[in-house]
Amino acid sequence: MARLTVEECMGRTNNKFKLVILASQRAHDLNSGACPVIKYKNGKNTVIALKEIAAKQLDVSSLFNLSVQRCRKYMEKFINSDEPYIAHKPKNNVDIFQASAVAGNSDGLENSSNSRDDNPLGRDNFFSTPENRNNTNS
């Protein structure tokens, strides 16, 4: 059902990425307490937002402007903040790869005594298919 709704919405905007922005803004509005323009029972707010856009019940340009304003407000708050950038983790938050390297495991994952398929994302197995893994590890 969502696929049909998206195809219907493409008549309003020819850019799928802009459609995502529009639908997310409208879903945000609905989650914040805005009343739906169309009646649609048992629907999630994302589907209702897409249905409203497809039914041409919303002004797409004003919806896009609301999204831009929300983004600007977030960016201003983020830029003016004295808080450290989100990518800088506190020192007490050690990731599993660093902890495993300290423990002496070069894979970044715990050693296991189980079968050879316990680590499908290991260095040697990451790009191989399951059939290749079974043939090379036998």
From Swiss-Prot:
Q: Region entry Disordered: which residue ranges?
A: 104-138
Which molecular function term from Gene Ontology is one that the record holds?
DNA-directed RNA polymerase activity
Reaction(s) catalysed (UniProt annotation): RNA(n) + a ribonucleoside 5'-triphosphate = RNA(n+1) + diphosphate
Q: Which Enzyme Commission numbers does its entry carry?
A: 2.7.7.6
Its GO biological process annotations read: DNA-templated transcription
> From start to end residue, where is composition biased (Polar residues)?
126-138
- What are its GO cellular component terms? DNA-directed RNA polymerase complex
A Pfam family reported for this protein in Swiss-Prot or TrEMBL: RNA_pol_Rpb6
What are the entry keywords?
Answer: DNA-directed RNA polymerase, Nucleotidyltransferase, Transcription, Transferase
Q: Could you describe the subunit structure of this protein?
A: The RNAP catalytic core consists of 2 alpha, 1 beta, 1 beta' and 1 omega subunit. When a sigma factor is associated with the core the holoenzyme is formed, which can initiate transcription.
Q: What does this protein do?
A: Promotes RNA polymerase assembly. Latches the N- and C-terminal regions of the beta' subunit thereby facilitating its interaction with the beta and alpha subunits.
**PANTHER family assigned:** DNA-DIRECTED RNA POLYMERASE SUBUNIT OMEGA
Which family is this sequence assigned to?
Answer: Belongs to the RNA polymerase subunit omega family.
Write the protein's name: DNA-directed RNA polymerase subunit omega
UniProt source species? Ehrlichia chaffeensis (strain ATCC CRL-10679 / Arkansas)
